[in-house]
From Swiss-Prot:
Record-level GO cellular component terms: cytosol
Taxonomic lineage from the root: Bacteria, Bacillati, Chloroflexota, Dehalococcoidia, Dehalococcoidales
Complex and partners: Tetramer of two alpha and two beta chains.
Entry protein name: Tryptophan synthase alpha chain
Pfam families, A to Z: Trp_syntA
PANTHER family in UniProt: TRYPTOPHAN SYNTHASE ALPHA CHAIN, CHLOROPLASTIC, TRYPTOPHAN SYNTHASE, ALPHA CHAIN
Length: 255
């Protein structure tokens, strides 16, 4: 069992996404330990990219600012290495394929392992086209986590169930990331459809912004993923007190 899948064994997993270097590296290094202290089980470190197709305005803006700050995959690896000394929860990179491919798949995976990263999510890489990076990840002892959406076919679900390690990322709705007031009424049926095939833990993301939503989704999933709301709170409150309060509320809603 990997460190990532192990994070689902004792309780509903709370997974937090942040963009590395937003609004600056110093904040990232303060924010991640704070997230762990207040109940996060897995941290997703977003690698900024100039064309984040799966992301809504909040993460797009965070990615743009991080790029303006000079954040590259190399910088993200350095930040992860620093965080490894500060936290005990698993770290997962989330990033688009192009920067990782350009960096070098084998080198990237090896450096991830050295930096203490346990796996990664590449939202624009279908599992049927992931053989090269899957091989490099396996050699480095990393999990590669694939996504499914409500529109996914039974064939795609079977493929992801065969390929994904650590957990499966279930997208709550078609479209892009971003906090939303209403999540699909048939979300539970989607999760249950995947569960008939998959053995991995199932975590739901895209649109979760309140403890009430988290509590409802946790009734039929193994974990929840929150990102845009965290970045919004970071933007409005540099002290990070609002983020800490929000994460504690999410943790309480899941326990």
């Amino acid at each position: 069992m990997s460190r990532i899948s192990d994070a689902f064994q004792k309780r509903k997993s709370l997974i937090a996404y942040i963009t590395v270097g937003y609004p600056d590296i110093e904040t990232t290094l303060r924010l991640v330990p704070l997230l762990e202290e207040n109940g996060v089980d897995i941290i997703e470190l977003g690698i900024p990219f100039s064309d984040p197709l799966a992301d809504g305005v909040t993460i797009q803006n965070a990615s743009y600012q991080a790029l303006q700050n000079g954040v590259t995959p190399e910088v993200c690896l350095s930040v992860a290495a620093l965080l490894k000394e500060k936290i005990s929860i698993p770290m997962v990179f989330m990033g688009y394929y192009n920067p990782i491919y350009n960096y070098g798949l084998t080198k990237f995976c090896q450096k991830c392992a050295t930096a203490g990263v346990s796996g990664f999510i590449i939202p624009d890489l279908p599992p049927g086209e992931a053989q090269d990076i899957d091989f490099a990840a396996t050699e480095a002892g990393l999990d590669i986590i694939f996504l499914l959406a409500p529109t996914s076919t039974d064939e795609r679900i079977k493929l992801v169930a065969a390929k994904s390690r650590g957990f499966i990322y279930l997208v709550s709705h078609s479209g892009v990331t971003g906090a939303t007031a209403n999540l699909p009424a048939d979300l539970s049926s989607f999760v249950n459809r995947v569960r008939k095939t998959a053995r991995q833990p199932l975590a739901v993301g895209f649109g979760i912004s309140t403890p009430e939503q988290a509590q409802n989704i946790a009734k039929f999933s193994d974990g929840i993923i929150v990102g845009s709301r965290i970045l919004q709170l970071v933007q409005t409150d540099p002290s990070l007190e609002k983020v800490a309060t929000f994460i504690r509320q999410l943790r309480q809603s899941l326990d």
